[in-house]
Curated annotation (Swiss-Prot):
<dbReference type="GO" id="GO:0005576">
    <property type="term" value="C:extracellular region"/>
</dbReference>
<keyword id="KW-0964">Secreted</keyword>
<protein>
    <recommendedName>
        <fullName>Prismalin-14</fullName>
    </recommendedName>
</protein>
<keyword id="KW-0732">Signal</keyword>
<comment type="function">
    <text>May be involved in calcification of the prismatic layer of the shell.</text>
</comment>
<feature type="signal peptide">
    <location>
        <begin position="1"/>
        <end position="16"/>
    </location>
</feature>
Length: 123
């Protein structure tokens, strides 16, 4: 029973990290950048109430299909030229961040988990 609770806690933490950490930029691969707010163009509620992100966010099972094809997100750029601009960042207006080279071990991933850029922090 205890091990089951531990597994459930780990799963909850993993899913929370998946939904909460945005601004993902994989340095030009698949042109992916969700700018921290997961398509705010279509769901403006994210800009003021980020807690609703997990509710409206597209189902995780489709992520490997959506991301390579519709990788650009909301307001801003996907990865660019192998370096990866972070797009327009927070809510489409503020921090951009820059993908830099390699991966960021201190930010939580999206699906591909390389070249992450969490709006300029911990690059």
């Amino acid at each position: 029973m205890r091990s089951l609770l531990v597994l459930l806690a780990l799963a909850a933490c993993a899913s929370a990290q998946f939904f909460i950490r945005g601004g993902d930029d994989d340095n030009g691969f698949f042109g992916d950048d969700d700018n921290g707010y997961y398509y705010p163009r279509y769901f403006p509620i994210y800009n003021r109430f980020p807690i609703y992100r997990p509710i409206y966010y597209r189902p995780q099972i489709y992520y490997p299909i959506y991301r390579p094809i519709f990788g650009y997100g909301g307001y801003g750029y996907g990865g660019y030229g192998g370096y990866g601009y972070g797009g327009y960042g927070y809510g489409g207006y503020g921090y951009g961040g820059y993908g830099g080279y390699g991966y960021n071990p201190y930010s939580y991933g999206g699906f591909y988990r390389f070249g992450d850029d969490d709006n300029g922090f911990d690059d």
